């Protein structure tokens, strides 16, 4: 067995760019004829993917799998924590939900099971791809001194696998020298030799402007600076919902404006990536307390805590704005938890969704739907035939608790019952909801929906013969890898 030295991407902080740099590294190694194996022992994210076997994993590891030329599998992210609010997270081990954990008890109750899940994930990866090279991503900072003893996914894993580590620092946020020197100073003596290089990320301007800083870092740390990556923040959307606050809307000339509700428990906002890539429209994030305005459509993404987000809609007055918008002929598209919010009634007998009690809870009443949370979580990929806004094959995945029932007045979105419904409104608008994550990845479906909006404004239709958004993602990964190969010297990192 030709077992290659694992590589690991660590960061001086959260948001340093570890996920993208890991994806870039995977694509570069794949180009060179290797089989990179992306792996993040523990991730905390509500942006999830469902693999072909119905296992749940972080979307960032799915993206890294595509970069590596692989189909995503949940072994690549054996521990996933999905925040629910109030310092509580759903715990996913090996793609399956195994319970809830409070922050203050997590390391006491879940450290040993988590480490076991990580070891099992590694075993699965190495058995499936015995000649591959593990490319690991760390989490947050590797030197949080109050957490180091129970670290699951940074230096414990690097030592366990004897990985060569690359330390990534984000210069855009300032303080990059203190970040790097401080991180290296807090490493234990046995950990310091694992760091083979430093990568400066998100540098603006000419690279030679950093030459003096590069020399200083190498002189004061003894660790080579392997590269200075340029600002590529617009290439991929952010992994974490907090980073959405930094997103700036497209301010160029556009034909359509779509308002997206940014509620506290937003999840699976990767559903919006295909719209971000559409040059003819502008996405505008609407936070609680903002004015909804008069967009061409409103999109309600998924929610990890539907009832909590419902309360936010009501307390902020966004519920009244949405109702007025729909009554006056507005168009709405809601995905998963967003669709549940639009319904007439929600029941939560197991109190899974952040409400105070079992309900029933009145929804926004914009679609005649009834939802009951509970039971086994629906986790599966789907390939179905769309019936609205046109007949076309579509694919995606389900990821939700409970079931939803519709009145006979609604029309199905596709030929599989229970996946979504739509209706025209008396004022000429349209309201639609679906459980199918990834719906907008389907190019022909997305363009048909956009063309409905364009027709209402008297605009010419867009071509509908587009490939799946995965093709666009592939092109972005190629551009990312091009930049990585141009600006980063991997030689020290790839030493045996």
Swiss-Prot record:
Pathway: Cofactor biosynthesis; adenosylcobalamin biosynthesis. Residues 255-445 form the GATase cobBQ-type domain. The active site is at 336 (nucleophile), 437. Keywords: Cobalamin biosynthesis, Glutamine amidotransferase. GO terms for molecular function: ABC-type vitamin B12 transporter activity; catalytic activity. One of its GO terms (biological process) is cobalamin biosynthetic process. It holds the Pfam family CbiA. PROSITE patterns: GATASE_COBBQ. PANTHER family: COBYRIC ACID SYNTHASE, DETHIOBIOTIN SYNTHETASE. Belongs to the CobB/CobQ family. CobQ subfamily. HAMAP family: CobQ (MF_00028). Catalyzes amidations at positions B, D, E, and G on adenosylcobyrinic A,C-diamide. NH(2) groups are provided by glutamine, and one molecule of ATP is hydrogenolyzed for each amidation. This is Cobyric acid synthase. The lineage of its organism: Bacteria, Bacillati, Cyanobacteriota, Cyanophyceae, Synechococcales. The gene is cobQ.
């Amino acid at each position: 067995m030709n077992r290659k030295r694992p590589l690991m991407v660590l960061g001086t902080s959260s948001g340093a760019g570890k996920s993208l740099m890991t994806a870039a590294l995977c694509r570069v190694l794949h180009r060179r004829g290797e089989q990179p194996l992306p792996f993040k022992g523990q991730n905390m994210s509500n942006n999830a993917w469902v693999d072909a076997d119905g296992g749940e994993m972080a979307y960032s590891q799915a993206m890294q799998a595509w970069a590596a030329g692989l189909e995503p599998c949940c072994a690549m992210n054996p521990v996933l924590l999905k925040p629910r609010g109030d310092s509580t997270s759903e715990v996913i081990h090996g793609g399956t939900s195994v319970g809830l954990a409070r922050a203050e008890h997590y390391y006491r109750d879940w450290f040993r099971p988590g480490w076991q899940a990580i070891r099992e994930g590694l075993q699965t990866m190495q058995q499936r791809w015995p000649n591959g090279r593990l490319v690991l991503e760390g989490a947050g900072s590797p030197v949080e001194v109050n957490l180091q003893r129970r670290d699951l996914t940074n230096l414990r894993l690097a030592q366990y696998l004897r990985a060569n580590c690359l330390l990534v620092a984000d210069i855009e946020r300032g303080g990059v020298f203190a970040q790097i020197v401080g991180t290296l100073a807090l490493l234990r003596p046995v950990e310091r030799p694992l760091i083979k290089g430093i990568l400066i990320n998100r540098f603006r301007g000419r690279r030679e402007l950093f030459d003096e800083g590069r020399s200083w870092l190498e002189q004061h740390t003894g660790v080579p600076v392997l590269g200075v990556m340029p600002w590529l923040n617009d290439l991929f959307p952010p992994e974490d919902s907090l980073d959405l606050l930094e997103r700036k809307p497209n301010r160029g000339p556009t034909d359509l404006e779509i308002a997206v509700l940014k509620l506290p428990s937003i999840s699976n906002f990767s559903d919006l990536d295909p719209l971000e890539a559409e040059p003819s429209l502008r996405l505008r994030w609407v936070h609680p307390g903002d004015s909804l305005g008069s967009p061409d459509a409103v999109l309600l993404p998924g929610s990890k805590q539907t009832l909590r987000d419902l309360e936010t809609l009501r307390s902020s007055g966004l519920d009244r704005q949405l109702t007025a918008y729909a009554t006056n002929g507005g168009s709405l598209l809601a995905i998963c938890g967003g669709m549940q919010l639009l319904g007439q009634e929600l029941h939560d007998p197991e109190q899974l969704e952040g409400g105070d009690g079992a309900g029933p809870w009145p929804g926004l009443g914009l679609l005649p739907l009834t939802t009951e949370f509970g039971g086994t979580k629906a986790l599966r990929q789907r390939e179905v035939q769309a019936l609205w806004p046109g007949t076309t094959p579509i694919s995606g995945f389900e990821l939700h608790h409970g079931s939803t029932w519709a009145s006979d007045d609604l029309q199905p979105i596709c030929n599989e019952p229970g996946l979504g419904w739509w209706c025209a409104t008396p004022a000429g608008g349209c309201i639609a909801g679906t459980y199918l994550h990834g719906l907008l990845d389907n190019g022909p479906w997305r363009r048909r929906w956009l063309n409905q909006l364009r027709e209402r404004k008297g605009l010419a239709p867009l071509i509908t013969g587009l490939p799946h958004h995965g093709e666009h993602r592939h092109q972005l990964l190629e551009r990312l890898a091009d930049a990585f190969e141009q600006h980063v010297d991997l030689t020290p990192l790839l030493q045996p």
